[in-house]
Each structure stands twice: as C-alpha cells, then as structure tokens.
C-alpha cells in the first residue's frame, strides 16, 4: 500500500509538471473544458477518470467531475480557498459534499461515498 501511494504521488507530480502554468483568474476556462492546469496553489487534473480541482493539495478538493456530475466541497477553510472556489466554479449545477466525502470521491468515486468508505 505504501508503494502505491508513492507511485501515485510521483505520477501526480509528473502530471503537474506537464500541466500549463496559468494565473488563477483564468482557471475557470480550464475547469469548464476539464483541462489540466497549475495555478498558484490551485490545480486541475484528471485522476482515475475523474476531473479534480484542488486548492493547496489533495487534502482540499474544491470540485470533482465524474460521469457528467459536478461535486462541490461546501466547507470553508480560509479566505484563499474561498477565492479559489469562486475562480474555478464551473458555472454548472453542483452537488454539495463535505470535504471528507470529496476526498473519498477523489480516490474512489461516488460509489465510495455510497458504500461508506473512509478517507
């Protein structure tokens, strides 16, 4: 299990290195097109067939798109993450989720929430 986490982390690091560096103000257009990007402490990337937007890393996913549905983290941590949410909102309907459920969706999909998987 530890090796898998290490490989995933290394793979994500390489994907982020290839993603275009953008300003946060332009991030929404990347989110709407579901394209990878790297902003200032703001990331958008594909993982396991899901498009994930994170603020300050994997512990705080803002938005996740899976199978035609957008999920939105409704928890607030800082003014900056709230600003990131505003800058990246896809301007489509979203289903509100807790941060814990968003991490489960990010790693296992919505089915992980349905079966009660832990973070």
Predicted regions and their residues:
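Terminal leader/tail segments of proteins
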Residues: 1-119
């Amino acid at each position: 299990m530890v090796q898998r986490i290490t490989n995933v982390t290394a793979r994500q690091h390489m994907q982020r290195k290839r993603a275009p560096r953008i300003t946060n103000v332009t991030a929404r257009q990347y989110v709407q097109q579901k394209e990878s990007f790297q902003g200032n402490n703001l990331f958008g990337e594909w993982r396991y067939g899901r498009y994930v937007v994170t603020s300050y890393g994997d512990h705080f996913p803002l938005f996740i798109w899976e199978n035609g549905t957008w999920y939105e983290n409704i928890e607030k941590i800082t003014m900056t993450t709230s600003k990131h949410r505003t800058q990246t909102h896809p301007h489509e309907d979203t289903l509100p989720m807790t941060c814990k459920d968003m991490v489960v969706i990010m790693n296992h999909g919505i089915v992980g929430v349905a079966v009660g998987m832990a973070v």
